[in-house]
From Swiss-Prot:
Keywords: Ribonucleoprotein, Ribosomal protein. The gene is rpmF. Belongs to the bacterial ribosomal protein bL32 family. It comes from Finegoldia magna (strain ATCC 29328 / DSM 20472 / WAL 2508) (Peptostreptococcus magnus). InterPro entries: Ribosomal_bL32, Ribosomal_bL32_bact, Ribosomal_zn-bd. One of its GO terms (biological process) is translation. This is Large ribosomal subunit protein bL32.
Length: 62
């Protein structure tokens, strides 16, 4: 039966476990219409454009 040759330290154990806790970095792009930061593949919150077209009318909010 396989047995570990040495005791695994708490630091080494925690470093191994921590790799699964890492969150992916959020990608932020700029809106080509107004230049404000936005998430990719989503409508711009500032101007309401998506894929070069006006999708949402934001004039009521302002």
């Amino acid at each position: 039966m396989a047995v570990p040759k040495r005791k695994t330290s708490k630091t080494r154990r925690d470093k191994r476990r921590a790799s699964s806790y890492k969150l992916p970095r959020v990608t932020i792009t700029t809106c080509p219409n107004c230049g404000s930061p936005k998430l990719p593949h989503r409508v711009c919150k500032e101007c309401g454009h998506y894929d070069g077209k006006q999708v949402v009318d934001n004039s009521e909010q302002n």
